[in-house]
Amino acid sequence: MNDKWYRHIIGARTIKTGLATFFTSLFCMLLNLTPIFAILTAIVTIEPTAKASLKKGYKRLPATVIGALFAVVFTYVFGDQSPLSYALSATFTILICTKLNLQVGTTVAVLTSVAMIPGIHEAYVFNFFSRLLTALIGLVTAGLVNFIILPPKYYHQLEEQLALSEKKMYRLFYERCNELLLGKFSSEKTSKELSKLNIIAQKVETLMSYQRDELHYHKNEDNWKLLNRLTNRAYNNRLFISHLSNIIYLPKHTSIAFDANEKIALINISNSINGIIQKGSFARQKKSIATLKSSVKQMDEFDQNQMKSTLIYEILLIYKILDSRYAK
């Protein structure tokens, strides 16, 4: 816990941005270069992972060169007092960066382009190469800071988001089963809750992608094992949500009649799943599962019970996912 105390006050990425700004400005001043352009580059170069910083840095450098080049060209043609110099520099920088697929560097390139115009005067070549050098300093400094200092660790966030996802999806399954038992086959409420659940699941995927990228640079066998465990957990959650969506998004005018035994089975299963978070374990409902399996066997998949058969299959698959997860 001692190495995480700063998270309660300031984020690691904020700290690294401050350090990158400090070192970038220091290096520029030592070389007697204007630091503002290097600082702009350094600030936007701090990404969630070192890999992202390096990958985007390869595109930000040429984009900055393009911006500086247009600033010099249009200042030479129209002068630094003409609005055309600013407008054309920005416009052509955006245009060329887009054409060359350098969109990640467009913002810095445009800012560099318009900001350097007032200071060019007659020193066109010097200003062009000095901006190129300062941009390189900003990129390299920020990349090294992001790589060396406080390497990102997303395990804690992943654990939190996975736990939140599981709590919500178990509760949503319980609520949806209650709706089905009450004959409410179309529900705006559960549809909205499912959308929120999918947003959390997407955030989990993003965090896992960040951590996977980071482990390519800071390799650790224990961390790889931990990430694999979290990945498997997230995969099972995705399967659960996929089957859950199939019992929420039903065709219009769906109408299903459950008999007394099927209703009791659904109540027992939904209560058991809803109680997982509170109890910390999964209480198997073998008798209820046997009831649903028996019901499916008696149905013809292609008669009027087709929708009911499909619905029960989805519930059985959800149960199987949890049965495997909590297997001893």
Swiss-Prot record:
It is a multi-pass membrane protein. Coiled coil: none annotated. The chain crosses the membrane at residues 26-46, 61-81, 109-129, 132-152. The keyword rRNA-binding does not apply. InterPro entries: ArAE_1. Keywords: Cell membrane, Membrane, Transmembrane, Transmembrane helix. It comes from the Bacteria. Signal peptide: none annotated. It is found in: Cell membrane. The keyword tRNA-binding does not apply. GO terms for cellular component: plasma membrane. Belongs to the UPF0421 family. This is UPF0421 protein SERP1427. It comes from Staphylococcus epidermidis (strain ATCC 35984 / DSM 28319 / BCRC 17069 / CCUG 31568 / BM 3577 / RP62A).
